[in-house]
């Protein structure tokens, strides 16, 4: 939104609610990058999708447990030519959307970013390299290239790989093992790596076998790559699911743990 602000190349809309919506309307969405803050002003921020009308591309970035309710609420922005790109955690997201909207064009997607909402309308980003992957092997390639160009113009590290299913499994592999162990032991990532690495490895190999049963060939070193990814995280950091358990909030345990079981 910051990159397209004041241009005619694209209109970026935010659909939000409650205190987040109020803050975005007053100050834009703010992203804190260390000592620097980026202010983004969308063309419109609203809790009423009907004010927007049918979109070309709809990025769905909600929690997985809100997916069905949110898709119903978003129907006013979903037209016959709208492409839905879900960036949710989970392996069955496309299927769940098609259960609600049969025949709608849905691409697959995932994003790598370390961030958290510190207050309404303010996001702290602590990752060093963000990446967004999207695609659909059966979708029109020109349309996918169009979106790729839009994202790259916004200076995002965007990729449209042919192996999008593998990319999503790799992302899920990393977050499922970490979310499950940090939540089960009620410990930080650093504590899990130091104290329970054997269980982390066991869960990793179990998930790898599930992937193979689904026809996904993960790299031989996937388990230890996931461990290495956790080791470079700050020792006191944890997962979103663990944080939600600590706060007594609703969690994505069914998506990140239950689905595998």
Region locations from a protein language model:
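NAD(P)-dependent Rossmann-like dehydrogenase/reductase catalytic/cofactor-binding core
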Residues: 142, 152, 201-261
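Short alpha-helical
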Residues: 19, 65-66, 91-92, 142, ...
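Residues at the C-termini of beta-strands that transition into short coil/loop
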Residues: 16, 35, 47-49, 88, ...
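Rossmann-like NAD(P)(H) cofactor-binding subdomain of soluble oxidoreductases
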Residues: 37-122
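NAD(P)+-binding Rossmann beta1-loop-alpha1 motif at the extreme N-terminus of oxidoreductases
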Residues: 1-37
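Internal alpha-helical scaffold of NAD(P)-dependent oxidoreductase catalytic cores
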Residues: 23, 76-77, 99-105, 120-220
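A structural signal for isolated positions on well-ordered beta-strands in alpha/beta enzyme cores
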Residues: 11-13, 85, 107, 133, ...
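Short, flexible turn/loop "capping" segments at secondary-structure junctions
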Residues: 51, 124-127, 234
């Amino acid at each position: 939104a910051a990159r397209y602000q004041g241009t005619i190349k694209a209109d970026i809309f935010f659909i939000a609610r409650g205190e987040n919506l109020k803050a975005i309307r007053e100050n834009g969405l703010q992203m804190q990058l260390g000592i620097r803050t980026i202010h983004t002003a969308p063309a419109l921020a609203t809790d009423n999708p009907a004010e927007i009308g049918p979109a070309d591309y709809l990025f769905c970035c909600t929690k997985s447990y809100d997916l069905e309710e949110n898709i119903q609420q978003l129907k006013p922005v979903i037209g016959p030519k709208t492409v839905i790109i879900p960036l949710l955690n989970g392996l069955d997201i496309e299927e769940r959307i098609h259960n609600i909207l049969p025949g709608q064009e849905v691409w697959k997607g995932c994003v790598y970013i370390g961030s958290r909402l510190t207050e309404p309308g303010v996001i702290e980003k602590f990752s060093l390299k963000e990446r967004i992957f999207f695609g659909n092997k059966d979708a029109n390639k020109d349309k996918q290239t169009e979106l790729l160009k839009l994202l790259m113009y916004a200076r995002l590290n965007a990729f449209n790989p042919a192996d999008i299913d593998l990319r999503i499994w790799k992302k899920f592999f990393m977050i499922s093992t970490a979310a499950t162990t940090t939540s089960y032991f009620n410990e930080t990532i650093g504590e899990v790596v130091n104290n329970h690495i054997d269980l982390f490895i066991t869960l990793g190999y179990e998930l790898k076998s599930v992937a193979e049963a689904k026809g996904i060939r993960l790299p031989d070193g996937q388990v230890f790559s996931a461990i290495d990814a956790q080791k470079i995280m700050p020792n006191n950091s944890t997962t979103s699911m663990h944080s939600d358990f600590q706060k007594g909030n609703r969690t994505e345990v069914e998506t990140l743990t239950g689905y595998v079981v």
